[in-house]
Amino acid sequence: MAKGQSLQDPYLNALRRERIPVSIYLVNGIKLQGQIESFDQFIILLKNTVSQMVYKHAISTVVPARSISHNNNGSSQAQAPQQAVQTTQPVEAIVATDKME
């Protein structure tokens, strides 16, 4: 097994096994959505209303609908999405502060 496959295969397998919806962005900018039905060294079968065979060399990014946690032993596990933490003031607060000056 190639060293580059050691992260890719468990990641794709977790997405497939958990039936996590994914968005796949191709290098030409096209966005495909569905669930990973199967994959091998060269292709990913993406299922939505139809099954599409997508060549990996045409893929730029795979974005799962929810987070995947990775264990050091190579296995992956799905997690519910985490809520974003707000670290700045809301825009309304900034606008209100500017008007008061």
Curated annotation (Swiss-Prot):
Residues 9-68 form the Sm domain. Residues 77-91 have a biased composition (Low complexity). Keywords: RNA-binding, Stress response. SUPFAM superfamilies: Sm-like ribonucleoproteins (SSF50182). It comes from the Bacteria. GO terms for molecular function: RNA binding. One of its GO terms (cellular component) is cytosol. Gene3D superfamilies: 2.30.30.100. Belongs to the Hfq family. RNA chaperone that binds small regulatory RNA (sRNAs) and mRNAs to facilitate mRNA translational regulation in response to envelope stress, environmental stress and changes in metabolite concentrations. Also binds with high specificity to tRNAs. PANTHER family: RNA-BINDING PROTEIN HFQ. Homohexamer. This is RNA-binding protein Hfq. It comes from Haemophilus ducreyi (strain 35000HP / ATCC 700724).
